[in-house]
Each structure stands twice: as structure tokens, then as C-alpha cells.
Amino acid sequence: MAALPIYLDNHATTRTDPRVVAAMLPYFTDIYGNPSSTNHVFGQAALAAVTSAREQVARLLHAPPNTILFTSGATESNNLALKGVAAAQRQRGRHLITVATEHKAVLDPCARLQRDGGEITILPVDGQGLVDPD
């Protein structure tokens, strides 16, 4: 019997929990509309599902539903967060600080912000990946 491979890339993607698969299955097979296309029943059902999910997350976080934003994944989330902070703080100056070991999904938007006139400081790390606080 061949040994099963060991999967060491869970930080990028993981096996989907069977409970999530069961909950999502109807949206892959029966209610597969685009929630932005509300001119048909499939889109309306998808929008209702997204609205319900947003309300559930908002309740868990004690936040207004209109402050909950879903993204396609980590890269989009990182871009949105970094660009949003830079835009919101434009009057105070756009200086972001990150570390050299940060993920490409953070370093790339930082580089873009720098090309657009923002100030980016990338802190080096030592051999153990630690930032020297001095």
C-alpha cells in the first residue's frame, strides 16, 4: 500500500469541513444564481442567502449588517484593507509599516501604494524571523 502524501499547504487552502459542504451543496446544484442578478428567481434566492449570511455574521460580531463585507479570499481582503487604510488616512500621511517576511498578498499592495506616493517601511527580520524592536 502506498503511503498517503502529507499536505503542508493548509495556510493556502484546506479541506472543506463536511458540514460546510452539506450547507453549501444546494448553492452549487440548485440555487446557483448570481446574487447581483435579481431579475430572476435564482439570483433572488442567492441574494437572500448572502443577506442572511451577512446578518448572521453581523449578529456574531455585534455589528451592523451593512458593515460586513464578503471577499473572494485573503488576497482580495488584504488589498481592500491596505488600500482602505491608506485612503482613510490620506490626510495624516500614508505611511505603512510591514515586515520583510510578510506574504506577497500584503507586500504587493504595499509596493503599489508606494508607487502611488505612499511611504512604506519594510522592517528586516533576523535569522529566526524576528523583528528587532530597536
Placement of each model-derived feature along the sequence:
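Pyridoxal 5′-phosphate
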Residues: 1-134
